[in-house]
Structures are given as structure tokens and as C-alpha cells.
Swiss-Prot record:
DNA-binding region: 83-158
Gene transcribed to yield this protein: NR2F1
Keyword Cell cycle: no
Designated name of the protein: COUP transcription factor 1
Organism annotation: Homo sapiens (Human)
Localization per Swiss-Prot or TrEMBL: Nucleus
């Protein structure tokens, strides 16, 4: 049986129904068309292909509309006998929704989940079967599959806004400005940005005032939030949650200190020597002069890396791409599929290059300068970061152990160590 979606209309329906402005209701019911008119209504201006009409017949088809809720079938779907399945559950597709051919059920489920920002939990092993008969049994795995097959969150968020109209405040820089007027964001970068759990306001005004000397308690709290936020961000970006848990742990255990430096630069974390030494407890325990000097050298290296990033005026989209490039490294030990991880790093790098060339056409060397900052992040010793920011919080517990606990617990902000207060 031929599949006809609501965005295509047989001209003879208009003639038979005496309704040149719309389809014949009886004929539409006989076809069993897709979603309701409110969901499937098309708007002019997107320029997507449509089924041509026979010359001289009334009832020209509606032009495709926003990227969100198209309901658009494949070309010629009204005349072919092709049956297109929902890429999520295998049921009969009603058209193209949020970038993929899906049924009405999966389309509505995805839209509801994204618009309401719903969070689901899998009671099994996060690998439940999703088909016509089991799609309602696990919402977590159903949403996971929607994202895996390529349904786009950003298409839902745009709703029916015209393509040229920006969504005010949708993506904000650390200074609170919307991406300096940049209207271009690839779908991948959009998802990276939406995974960011730490807007500047979360850390208060102190974090944004480099000349303000923070107290030890504030330093401990801010550092903990930056670390926890890095893990939370990784858990919500594309592709990372689909990796084996052992691979997730390996990647974060290797790269956590680099992500921490990037987050510190992004929020303009004050790095004054005196409170950092106090936070590290150097005044409480005897230390040789040589060791103190060496420790201060490490602090200087940390400060330099942060300042060099700040000097480039890196925006939020660039920070997200840089963190993804750092995270998806095949250098981690014991990866089950290093080639796949490397391909994700290449995808992140290509997304950054495309974004930079589109948004900064007058800075041809900007992409190279950003990439050149990444190798030097490893010059900041992870053990020094632990001593500076976390020894008062968790004692001798290795950061790698904490990261593993955060991943396994499923929530960084409800992590048990957060109950420990800096003293």
C-alpha cells in the first residue's frame, strides 16, 4: 500500500471534494495520512523539494516548513509502493520528522522528551530492544535510540520559528552574550552546547571577576563543580553515552585534568597564588624551599595556559568542540575500539574547523591557533591540580576513583563526596 504523508496532496482530491484550498477529508481518511494538521502544516521559505503538480490542476502542495516538524515524505512517495519504516522502532513511517523518517508515536515521544527536558532511567543494562512491540517498555533506551539514529534535538527546540530568526539566549557565552550574533551552529555543536551543565550564573559573580581573590572555601567549591560538570557534560554529549562504561572511565581518567583547565579558562577562574597555596595546605605541612618553588612553577604553568586561552577570546561553541577533541582521544589505555574513538575526535575537529571558518572568516589562522593550545594542556600536572584543589575535599582519594564513582552513580551533582565541606 502506498504511503502518503500530509505534506503531499492529490490534485483530484480537491476537485472531487469541491475544496480547492485543502484536501478532501474523506480521501484523507482513506489514505490514513500521518499526523494532525497542526503538526504537519508546512510553511514556505525553506526551499526543500516537493512533489510537482500536474499543470492546470488546483491545489498546489504546501511548501516544506521549519526543520522541526516537517512530516515530509520521500520524493514520489505518493505514487510509489515503497514502504518506509520508522528508523527507531520499525513501524510504518509517517514522514520525516526532526531529520529522520519516523512513525507518529516516536515523533511525538521525541518531541515531548526534548521540549519538557525529561530524564529517564533504564532499569536494565541500557540496551533494551526498541521495536513496535517493546518501544514503550523503556523510555530511556527509546530516547537513546532516537538520538543514535540522528533525530535532532535542536530541530525540536526551534519549533516553528523562521530559519533566519535566532532563538534569543539559546546559547550563551561566558560573558552572557548570545554567541556574538553567530547564527550558524551545526547539529553536532548544538548538542555539545546543550550538554553544558554549568552556565556562568551557577558559580556566581566571583568566578567572573579575575581580580577578586576568592577564599579557600570558594576555591574548593568552584573546583569541585568544574570537575563534576566536566563529567556531567561528557555523559550527555553525543556518542559518549553509547560507549562501553570501561571506555568512558578510561577516557575521563586520562583527560579530566585537561577538561578542568578548559573549564577554568571558560569561567575565568581566578588563580591567585596565595589562596591556591593555602588551599593546597602547604602552610600546614612542612615543605622544603625547593619543593615550594617547584609547586609555584606548576601554578605559573596553570595560569599561563588559562591566560593564553582567554587571550584568544574562545567562544562557547569553540570550547565545546575543544573539549570533545580532548575527550575523544585514542591515547587512552584499554579502549575496546580505538579506531571508533579516533573517528569521533575527527568529527569534533571537523565541526570546529567548519564553525571557525564560517564565523571568523577574517581570522584564517584561528582554527590552527585553537588546536595548538590543546597539546600544552597536558603540561599542567594532574597531581598538582589534585593537590591545589581537591586534597581538602577528598583527602588522599585519587581523582580517577572519584570519576569512576561519578560515572557509575549516574549523577555528578548528587555525588556523595559533595556532602563534604571545605574547611
Amino acid at each position: 500500500m502506498a504511503m502518503v504523508v500530509s505534506s503531499w496532496r492529490d490534485p483530484q482530491d480537491d476537485v472531487a471534494g469541491g475544496n480547492p484550498g485543502g484536501p478532501n477529508p474523506a480521501a484523507q481518511a482513506a489514505r490514513g495520512g500521518g499526523g494532525g494538521a497542526g503538526e504537519q502544516q508546512q510553511q514556505a521559505g525553506s526551499g526543500a523539494p516537493h512533489t510537482p503538480q500536474t499543470p492546470g490542476q488546483p491545489g498546489a502542495p504546501a511548501t516544506p516548513g521549519t526543520a522541526g516538524d516537517k512530516g515530509q515524505g520521500p520524493p514520489g512517495s505518493g505514487q510509489s509502493q515503497q514502504h518506509i519504516e520508522c528508523v527507531v522502532c520499525g513501524d510504518k513511517s509517517s514522514g520525516k520528522h526532526y531529520g529522520q523518517f519516523t512513525c507518529e508515536g516516536c515523533k511525538s515521544f521525541f518531541k515531548r522528551s526534548v521540549r519538557r527536558n525529561l530524564t529517564y532511567t533504564c532499569r536494565a543494562n541500557r540496551n533494551c530492544p526498541i521495536d513496535q512491540h517493546h518501544r514503550n517498555q523503556c523510555q530511556y533506551c527509546r530516547l537513546k535510540k532516537c538520538l543514535k539514529v540522528g533525530m535532532r534535538r535542536e530541530a525540536v527546540q526551534r519549533g516553528r520559528m523562521p530559519p533566519t530568526q535566532p532563538n534569543p539566549g539559546q546559547y550563551a557565552l561566558t560573558n552572557g552574550d548570545p554567541l556574538n550574533g553567530h547564527c550558524y551552529l551545526s547539529g553536532y555543536i548544538s548538542l555539545l552546547l546543550r550538554a553544558e551543565p554549568y552556565p556562568t550564573s551557577r558559580y556566581g559573580s566571583q568566578c567572573m571577576q579575575p581580580n577578586n581573590i576568592m577564599g579557600i572555601e570558594n576555591i574548593c567549591e568552584l573546583a569541585a563543580r568544574l570537575l563534576f560538570s566536566a563529567v556531567e557534560w561528557a555523559r550527555n554529549i553525543p556518542f559518549f553515552p553509547d560507549l562501553q562504561i570501561t571506555d568512558q572511565v578510561s577516557l575521563l581518567r586520562l583527560t579530566w585534568s585537561e577538561l578542568f583547565v578548559l573549564n577554568a579558562a571558560q569561567c575565568s577562574m581566578p588563580l591567585h597564588v596565595a589562596p591556591l597555596l593555602a588551599a593546597a595546605g602547604l602552610h600546614a605541612s612542612p615543605m622544603s624551599a625547593d619543593r615550594v618553588v617547584a609547586f609555584m612553577d606548576h601554578i605559573r604553568i596553570f595560569q599561563e595556559q588559562v591566560e593564553k586561552l582567554k587571550a584568544l577570546h574562545v567562544d562557547s561553541a569553540e570550547y565545546s568542540c575543544l573539549k570533545a577533541i580532548v575527550l575523544f582521544t585514542s591515547d587512552a589505555c584499554g579502549l575496546s575500539d580505538a579506531a571508533h574513538i579516533e573517528s569521533l575526535q575527527e568529527k569534533s575537529q571537523c565541526a570546529l574547523e567548519e564553525y571557525v571558518r564560517s564565523q571568523y572568516p577574517n581570522q584564517p589562522s584561528r582554527f590552527g591557533k585553537l588546536l595548538l593550545r590543546l597539546p600544552s594542556l597536558r603540561t599542567v600536572s594532574s597531581s598538582v591540580i589534585e593537590q591545589l584543589f581537591f586534597v581538602r575535599l577528598v583527602g588522599k582519594t585519587p581523582i580517577e576513583t572519584l570519576i569512576r564513582d561519578m560515572l557509575l552513580s549516574g549523577s555528578s551533582f548528587n555525588w556523595p563526596y559533595m556532602s563534604i565541606q571545605c574547611s
